[in-house]
Amino acid sequence: MELTKEQLKQLLPKNPYIDQWHKALSQLLPDYEINTPQRIAAFIAQCAHESGGFIFLTENLNYKAESLVKVFPKYFKDITTAKAYEKKPEKIANKIYANRMGNGDELSGDGWKYRGRGLIQLTGKTNYSWFAASLNITPDEADRKSTRLNSSHVSE
């Protein structure tokens, strides 16, 4: 089965880059055997959920203090703690992703470096490493490749 441009428009009505996404998906989906209605639906649904309809390709961590307490209560137990991180995405990433998913501690900067990116919002040094290994590149190259792809996908 092939995903048509019209189907993609119906699934992603607010996305201004349908032509580019359709071209990319038409080339890549068959390579990964995403070729049945069920597989295509699952893939598109997961990616659309993670990326806000194929629009946000880098995790948005620009939270107000009140939201930090609600969304990340494990890390922000009270509003006073959250205020120190409010509207500081890099600092937030380094706190919430510290010492997990292969990342170092908060001071390592790994949380920010390996924050969610791409349609699936790949997150964490371990996941970047697995992704990089599948492409025979280093995690740092995967980070640069992801950043480059995310910033240029609409200009191709």
Question: Language-model features: where?
Answer:
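Substrate-binding clefts and substrate-entry loops adjacent to catalytic sites
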Residues: 6-9, 128-146
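Structural motif
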Residues: 32-39, 108-114, 144-146
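Short, functionally critical alpha-helical segments immediately adjacent to catalytic or ligand/cofactor-binding
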Residues: 39-54, 86-103, 122
